């Protein structure tokens, strides 16, 4: 086996992106022979300081060159003769100049009078020519501004690696008619829950037409829900979870559309109601009305996930309370010992507005106190309990057309004595809170475990 001795000579390699048909022109694109020699010598001593630029238009002074990147190599340089395939002059390649950066945007100055004038005067370094150089200050339109290009247009030197790939969750399926279509194979199952509002004439009586047959697991949850809806036709999701086996938690939202519909407005908002049952036509449904509260809690508030309100303990995950689930000794009697309406109201349901808003103000006062880690103020509670129950027409006519200044004056009028500033402040806060409208879209984090009640 023949062996060759590697020479002690070391070389630098330049990977030029063009064809070297003309040797002189080839060297000019790299700045000339002297620039090449200087860059190669510097690469062996200090590679970071080696500068070699590629200029595809050497005669254009405004061309933006591409700088080479120097990399250390341990390659071999050989000379091969085609006649006899012999190998000679084996040497080492220690440094390589690579032009891998993207070329900058180029701007041609060939038709620029200002650049031509600049080159013929300042660049020749002639005193008389420089002395004659002047800039025309005549105003021109912006689109006709003639000026030299900037030294750099783009600061992006390397191309972006986008890695464009087809969505792995999307696939092509064949339809019954023979055509093909692209579908999301791993998409979230849609929950075909029927929703309704207080403006409809009749409530839904059966499930959605697009709802298919339930799976075995979903059917088990349905069978567990049937006796609950027979006993009580209107439920919140949290109340149902507390009456079901914990293993059914994930499947509840898929089982509810088979038995119930969802209210999106009115006094039964965000409650699931048994198909065919209309709480607007049954005064006994007053016990199933729901009260909503916007509570902004921090991470320190933790509690049992219950649907019952006792007025003493804060349960952060529950923001919706049904009347039948309120056991607070102060509030519960107000809901039981009251005269109901003859017809269901779109906002306050079967309760008269005066009693309804009094209960809501009491619950809000207690909830805000519990958030602060305190017990509700007896002064505030008694003030609400002793306040006159104003019907809705009188309640809003006094305040809707008044600003904050008029509100303060009204509070002072209600408290004729005006001797206790603390009581006045409490009344102002209570009235402001009572006038806050709690929209369905404003409820924040009604339930952390079940944000998507409708599905995608």
From Swiss-Prot:
Compositionally biased region (Acidic residues): 441-456
InterPro entries in the cross-refs: TF_IIIC_su-5_HTH, TF_IIIC_Tfc1/Sfc1, Tfc1/Sfc1_N, TFIIIC_tauA_Sfc1
Compartment(s) where it occurs, according to its Swiss-Prot or TrEMBL record: Nucleus
Pfam families: Tau95, Tau95_N
Polar residues bias locations: 407-416
UniProt-listed Gene3D superfamilies: TFIIIC, subcomplex tauA, subunit Sfc1, barrel domain (3.30.200.160)
PTM annotation, UniProt: Phosphorylated.
GO CC aspect terms: cytoplasm; cytosol; nucleus; transcription factor TFIIIC complex
Main location: nucleus
GO molecular function, one term: RNA polymerase III cis-regulatory region sequence-specific DNA binding
GO BP annotations listed: transcription initiation at RNA polymerase III promoter
Region Disordered, residue ranges: 394-416, 437-456
Function: TFIIIC mediates tRNA and 5S RNA gene activation by binding to intragenic promoter elements. Upstream of the transcription start site, TFIIIC assembles the initiation complex TFIIIB-TFIIIC-tDNA, which is sufficient for RNA polymerase III recruitment and function. Part of the tauA domain of TFIIIC that binds boxA DNA promoter sites of tRNA and similar genes. Participates in the interconnection of tauA with tauB via its contacts with sfc3 and sfc6. Serves as a scaffold critical for tauA-DNA spatial configuration and tauB-DNA stability.
Assembly and interaction partners: Component of the TFIIIC complex including sfc1, sfc3, sfc4, sfc6 and sfc7. The subunits are organized in two globular domains, tauA and tauB, connected by a proteolysis-sensitive and flexible linker. Interacts with sfc3, sfc4 and sfc6.
Name the UniProt record assigns to this protein: Transcription factor tau subunit sfc1
Organism: Schizosaccharomyces pombe (strain 972 / ATCC 24843) (Fission yeast)
């Amino acid at each position: 086996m023949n062996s060759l001795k590697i020479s002690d000579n070391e070389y630098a390699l330049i990977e030029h992106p063009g064809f070297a048909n003309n040797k002189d022109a080839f060297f000019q694109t790299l700045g000339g022979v002297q620039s090449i020699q200087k860059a190669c010598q510097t690469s062996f001593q200090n590679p970071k300081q080696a500068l070699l630029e590629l200029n595809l238009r050497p005669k254009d002074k405004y061309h933006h060159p591409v700088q080479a990147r120097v990399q250390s190599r341990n390659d071999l340089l050989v000379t091969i003769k085609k006649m006899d395939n012999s190998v000679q002059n084996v040497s080492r390649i220690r440094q390589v100049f690579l032009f891998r950066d993207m070329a900058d945007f180029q701007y041609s100055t060939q038709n620029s009078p200002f650049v031509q004038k600049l080159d013929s005067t300042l660049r020749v370094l002639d005193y008389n020519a420089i002395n004659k150089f002047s800039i025309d200050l005549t105003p021109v339109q912006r689109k006709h501004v003639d000026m030299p290009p900037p030294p750099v247009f783009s600061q992006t030197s390397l191309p972006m690696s986008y890695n464009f790939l087809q969505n792995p969750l999307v696939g092509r399926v064949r339809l019954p008619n023979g055509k093909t279509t692209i579908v999301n194979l791993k998409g979230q199952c849609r929950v075909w829950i029927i929703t309704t509002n207080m403006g409809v004439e009749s409530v839904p009586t059966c499930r959605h037409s697009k709802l298919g047959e339930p799976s075995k697991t979903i059917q088990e949850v349905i069978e567990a829900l049937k006796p609950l809806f027979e006993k009580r036709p209107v439920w919140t999701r949290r109340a149902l979870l507390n009456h079901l086996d914990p293993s059914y938690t994930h499947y509840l939202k898929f089982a509810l559309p088979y038995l119930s519909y969802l209210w999106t407005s009115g006094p039964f908002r965000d409650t699931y109601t048994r198909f065919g049952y209309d709480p607007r036509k049954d005064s006994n449904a007053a016990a199933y009305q729901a009260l909503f509260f916007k509570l902004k809690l921090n991470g320190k508030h933790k509690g049992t996930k219950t649907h019952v309100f006792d007025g003493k303990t804060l349960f952060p995950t529950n923001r919706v309370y049904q009347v039948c689930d309120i056991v607070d000794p102060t509030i519960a009697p107000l809901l039981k010992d009251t005269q109901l309406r003859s017809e269901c109201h779109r906002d306050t349901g079967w309760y008269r507005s005066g009693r309804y808003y009094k209960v809501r103000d009491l619950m809000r006062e207690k909830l805000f106190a519990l958030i602060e880690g305190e017990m509700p103020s007896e002064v505030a509670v008694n003030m609400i309990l002793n306040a006159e129950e104003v019907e809705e027409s009188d309640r809003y006519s006094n305040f809707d057309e008044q600003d904050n200044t008029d509100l303060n004056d009204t509070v002072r009028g209600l408290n004729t004595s005006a001797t206790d500033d603390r009581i006045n402040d409490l009344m102002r806060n209570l009235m402001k809170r009572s006038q806050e409208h709690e929209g369905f879209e404003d409820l924040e984090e009604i339930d952390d475990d079940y944000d998507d009640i409708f599905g995608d």
